[in-house]
Regions:
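Left-handed beta-helix
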Residues: 9, 15, 20-21, 26-35, ...
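Leucine-rich solenoid repeat scaffolds
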Residues: 89-91
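Terminal amphipathic alpha-helical/low-complexity segments used for targeting or macromolecular assembly
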Residues: 1-10
């Protein structure tokens, strides 16, 4: 499934990513998530999103988080519950 999503939609979410219940992907295209990322429950992610890098500690995203389009979340970041990250942000 990972390779099919990657090829067809440009979504790279490795099977090792920990994802809580109720993840919503709006306009799913151009999404890259590092393999050690943790995403809480009921999160909403938008297109052109990058989370993490190839080294260091993972990004941890809390519950009920909205991430707008064209956002870059780097490694070693903890995003709290009930947070909104606006379009084009670098965290």
């Amino acid at each position: 499934m990972y390779s099919r999503l990657s090829r067809k939609y440009g979504i790279q979410i490795p099977p090792t990513v920990k994802i809580g219940y109720g993840l919503y992907i709006g306009h799913g295209i151009g999404i890259i998530i590092n393999d050690s990322t943790v995403i809480g429950s009921n999160c909403n992610i938008s297109q052109f999103l990058t989370i993490g890098s190839n080294r260091g500690t993972p990004a941890i995203i809390g519950d009920n988080v909205y991430i707008g389009p064209s956002v870059c979340i780097v490694e070693n970041v903890r995003i709290g519950n009930n947070t909104t990250i606006g379009a084009g942000s670098v965290v």
